[in-house]
Amino acid sequence: MTASGLYLNLSIGSADAPILQVDTTIATRGITAIFGPSGSGKTTLLRCIAGLTRATSGNILFNGAVWQDQTQFLAPHKRPIGYVFQDANLFSHLTALGNLQFAIKRANNASANELLDKVVALLGLQSLLNRYPNQLSGGEKQRVAIARALLICPQLLLMDEPLASLDEQRKQEILPYLEALHEEFSTPILYVSHAMNEVARLADNMLVLNNGTVVAHGNLNQVLTDTQSPTAQGEDTCVVLNATVESKDTKWQLICARISNAQLWIKAPDHATAINQTLRVRILARDVSLSLSEHSDSTILNKLAATVISISDDTDSAMALVKLAVGSDTLLARITRKSAHHLALQPNMQLWAQVKSVAIVG
């Protein structure tokens, strides 16, 4: 147990039939994604942290302060948290501004009033302040709900699938606001999701739940490239890398960005990019093919010298997952077992990873 971080050692249910059993410490910085399939215990864990659900037994400490143990249970309103639910849960009789002012009163913090203008600008709420919730779209409601949670001046922000009730267009509208929130505020965020594209775009760290237990926890890419983790199975298997913009090819609308010791050609994004800017890129394992030699007569632009780390079984019995080292970075390739057999893949083998598609996610 450490004095810093969110320490969780809790269980719900009985010893014979546990619903949730967690023993870990979550870093109180950046965004930690709590990821897993439906029914894995994500929302239950978040509600325990918030005090909305009382764990059957165990301890919850936040930076050394006891929120729950054998003798005490801190009520939700006494925990320094903000909570954003799947549904915005705005007060229907108050305007957007009224909802924000309610949060400021609850905060009882002089800095909350000073924070109002910054939060309104950051989340693009200027034109919405005089509207009532029934006059707002789903995405607009969630932006107001996020602002309301921030104006409580929380030490920890909990977000329970805040985009789950939105259609794809609304999700794409709100994601840049969440990225801006991450950049502008130091408040640590626990972000519950079962959508890998959201996690890849937002998270610094990742905690994976399955059947009520923690099966992986750590830095985002460490978890994504752990071939024993559920995240490294199936069609969404991916890695997330930082790439530095080196040059632009305006003729072909491409940018060249560097990962550790290799270059990636990437379709230029709609927004402007600068030389030396760091981009977050996502590479799906299914978009990586392997070759024993470098092919120049191919439509694939990205051919990276790589070394095989391991070959693992996939949940699909016809597929295999190959873990690769590209300099100090790690890639995953999802190929057929027949292809792995044909190439006689072995650990430490040198080969070429051909990356069909690279997506900029941040």
From Swiss-Prot:
Top-rank taxon, per record: Bacteria
One Pfam family cited in the UniProt record for this chain: TOBE
What region holds the Mop domain? 297-362
Q: What keywords appear on the UniProt entry?
A: ATP-binding, Cell inner membrane, Cell membrane, Membrane, Molybdenum, Nucleotide-binding, Translocase, Transport
The record, for PROSITE patterns, names: ABC_TRANSPORTER_1, ABC_TRANSPORTER_2, MODC, MOP
Alphabetized GO MF terms: ABC-type molybdate transporter activity; ATP binding; ATP hydrolysis activity
- The answer to whether keyword Disulfide bond applies is no
Which Gene Ontology cellular component terms are annotated?
A: plasma membrane
Q: Which residues form the ABC transporter domain?
A: 1-236
- Signal sequence interval, chain numbering: none
Location in or out of the cell: Cell inner membrane
Gene3D superfamilies linked to this entry: 2.40.50.100, P-loop containing nucleotide triphosphate hydrolases
Per the record, the similarity remark reads: Belongs to the ABC transporter superfamily. Molybdate importer (TC 3.A.1.8) family.
Question: Which PANTHER family does its entry note?
Answer: ABC TRANSPORTER I FAMILY MEMBER 10, MOLYBDENUM IMPORT ATP-BINDING PROTEIN MODC 2
Assembly with partners or alone: The complex is composed of two ATP-binding proteins (ModC), two transmembrane proteins (ModB) and a solute-binding protein (ModA).
The record's function comment reads: Part of the ABC transporter complex ModABC involved in molybdenum import. Responsible for energy coupling to the transport system.
What this protein is called in its record is Molybdenum import ATP-binding protein ModC
Gene that encodes it: modC
